[in-house]
Amino acid sequence: MKKITLIALILAFFTTFGNAAEVNVFSARHYDSDIQLYEKFTAKTGIKVNVISGKDKALQKRIVEEGADSKADIYITADAGRLGAFDAKGMFQNSMTPVIKSAVPKNFRSTNWTGIAK
């Protein structure tokens, strides 16, 4: 996937938050490239990205325990198996956008999650 496509995809995710002044990303990933994408997003939109980092199990447990009061807007993991299992629990909402639909092959997305890579 080209870098521009990934940036557009990340923007597509985040722009679903409308006029939000900030977005909370719960991330089990620890890559410098992720931080660079968040910084580019903030520079382009003015929306602050708050990153809450942790291990998959701990982040998922927190999201489940907080329920509807969860501060998580986006959950990112490097483990597709955990992603699928979390989706099966009904923990995600529909995130399909026209940008995602056109940029991401069907086998790397569902209506509730999308796989990304750099």
Regions found by a protein language model. Give the residues of each.
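A structural signal for short loop-to-beta-strand junctions that line the ligand-binding cleft
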Residues: 70-75, 93-118
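Early extracytoplasmic/lumenal segment of secretory-pathway proteins
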Residues: 21-85
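Residues in and immediately flanking transmembrane alpha helices
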Residues: 15-16, 63, 86, 92
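Bacterial N-terminal signal peptides
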Residues: 5-16
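A broad, low-specificity signal marking well-ordered, structured residues that form hydrophobic/aromatic
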Residues: 18, 23, 93
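Glycine-rich, phosphate-binding/catalytic loops in enzymes
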Residues: 42-43, 88-94
